[in-house]
Amino acid sequence: MSSNQEPLVEGKIKDKHSETHGFEVDVNQMMDTMIKSVYSSKELFLRELVSNSSDACDKLKALYFQLREKGCVLDPVTSLGIEIIPNKDNRTLTIKDNGIGMTKPDLMNFIGTIASSGTKKFREEMKEKGNSADASNLIGQFGLGFYSSYLVAERVDLITKHPSDEALVWTSTGRDVYTIEEYDGEPFAHGTSLVLYIKEGEEEFLDPKRISEIVKKYSLFVFYPIYTYVEKEIEEPEEKKDEEKEDEKVEEETAEPRVEEVREKRLKKVTEREQINVEKPLWKRNIKEVPEEELKSFYKTVSGDWDDFLAVDFWHIEGLLSIELLMFIPKRARFDMFNKNKKNNNIKLYCKNVFVTDDFGDAIPEWMSFVSGVVASDDIPMNISREMIQGTNVMKLVKKTLPQKIFEMIGKLALDAEKYKTFYKEFGNCLKMAIGEASEGQQDGYAKCLRYFTTKSGEEAISLDTYVERMAPNQKQIYVITGLSKEQVKSNPALDAFQKYEVIYMHEVMDEVMLRGLKKYKGHTIQRITSEGVELPEDEASNEEVVKSFEEFCKKVKDILSSKVEKVTVNPRLVSVPAVISTTKYSLSGTMENIMKSQPVTEANPFAAMTAVSKKIFEMNPNHQLVKNLKALFDSNEIEKMNRILEVFFETVLIHNGFVLSDPKGFCANVFDFLCSEEVRCEEPVEEVQ
């Protein structure tokens, strides 16, 4: 645009001769584009058509007494239902209901007019009459669900009858025309039968097993019963001839044993009607009044677990949206619970009893992968295909609320000691993951669910609250020891200096992960006894002279060990062990060093290998004879001899403290050389063996 050209402003230009035109529509192209682009999967057609049938039944139910007063002949409300009838011979799939049916204007306005929703209009009419509760369960809203038929059908016949009108047949191939004619088949009171003529290549939708699978996935909790027809083989009873009956009568009279001839079983094929959606939406009921067996059956259906659940709870949440949460904790962990490649789909979202998604993204944290259940709402804003949620309010509400509710559930479970033992054995690591990721404000509430064995707990694991209650006078820290097995932590030489105090055993990888986030509990610092920063209640002034007397010796040991250690000191609190290895305050712990070194990426990456090394503190026991001997060598300036002993001593202490040696072959060579040295040589000469 040139600098002197005036911009076009709305309303600036008026043309007295302007013409108004309607948009022209290429119906064939639009239908094809709409059908293929709206739905991500062809199987969704069945969800849409079942939902339409459910709405039709709801409408009849809402208008039942009005229609009766008008003299309409109606099926009993209790008989309302949906049938899905596959016919492989005719290549047809029929979805049939005995709901409200449609009049000719309905067919033209809502089937013949794209994106015009009869259900939406019905809902609005009921709301105007003050009967919105009667329409609260209606699913449809966009007026497009019917056209999903053409995902799998080349032609659709819609046979329908409104209670106050004649039966009609609507037919179309999904192109630019449709026909409506009177139905002259078998009479029926009301309802709709949708006959789909299945396309080539879509035969899977004629398989009763596939039909059942799709219905269970999307429409399992639709209020009305959904039936399909299944072909089965049953044993055909064999009619006995008169002479055989006579023989049996004679044998009964003689009562003599006889050998019966084994006859080949004759099987015949029969077609039986089976209900697919046996389970009911339990979140619509008071969970305390639901029988245990019904809850167990529901749990197995939504979770896919073969065993019963350990705990169940229900919450109704009111916020920007109204949602129900029905959650279950299983008895045992799935073998693939922490498999990063497997999507966590144990919690499912339902809107008006129809499945929407099991993908909550980051709204459901990884640690909750053991929980199964349902998030349900009747007022979730949906996108046009009803596969995704519009906006973020639902996910925000789930993300904020659900983890807190699960920990409430776990807290209730902890009141039953035996059940909680089962839970903690299976899912304790999930709790630790949650605590490590939680904010500081949440951590205390979550961490009270932890249970640990300690140096003084005996056979019963205790909570952190119990530990704090039992802390020594003036003890400010919670003492913990970490490792990779029970045996390793129980035998760690660092415990030698803590015989007066209770120390918590943490022997799982997830403990290390948790401690990276959990620094305090109820104001008490959580302190590894193998890390720098330990504060003991006792007065350490009496040890100052001992420490001072070893200062020069410690400097020399540091010079000899060089980069292998960050610091060398003496620890007068040690009792029976000659030395321990601890780590500096902000370094990796010894356990984390071992974990990182065991990872394949560390072996292949020199930089990763370099960072997977903790900064070590060599703490020697000044009262141990071995340390006294080394100091005596230092004092007498026998440095070479001291070096040789110190090298073996240090690496032995590393092993004793659970570290993995970087050069085990070199260590063995040093030990063998030491064993052959003068220090351990026999005084009497040994005769050479011939």
Swiss-Prot record:
Record's GO cellular component terms: cytoplasm
Compositionally skewed regions (Acidic residues) per UniProt: 244-254
Coiled coil ranges: none
Residue ranges annotated as motif TPR repeat-binding: 686-690
A Pfam family assignment: HSP90
Main location: cytoplasm
Binding-site list for ATP: N52, D97, F146, R386
Superkingdom field: Eukaryota
Subcellular location(s) of the protein: Cytoplasm
Chain positions covered by the region annotation Disordered: 235-257
CDD domains registered for this protein in UniProt: HATPase_Hsp90-like (cd16927)
Any one GO MF annotation of this record: ATP hydrolysis activity
Record keywords, A-Z: ATP-binding, Chaperone, Cytoplasm, Nucleotide-binding, Stress response
Database matches in HAMAP family: HSP90
Domain notes: The TPR repeat-binding motif mediates interaction with TPR repeat-containing proteins.
Annotated family: Belongs to the heat shock protein 90 family.
Protein task: Molecular chaperone that promotes the maturation, structural maintenance and proper regulation of specific target proteins involved in cell cycle control and signal transduction. Undergoes a functional cycle that is linked to its ATPase activity. The nucleotide-free form of the dimer is found in an open conformation in which the N-termini are not dimerized and the complex is ready for client protein binding.
Subunit details: Homodimer.
Stated name of the protein: Heat shock protein 90
Native source organism of the sequence: Encephalitozoon cuniculi (strain GB-M1)
Underlying gene: HSP90
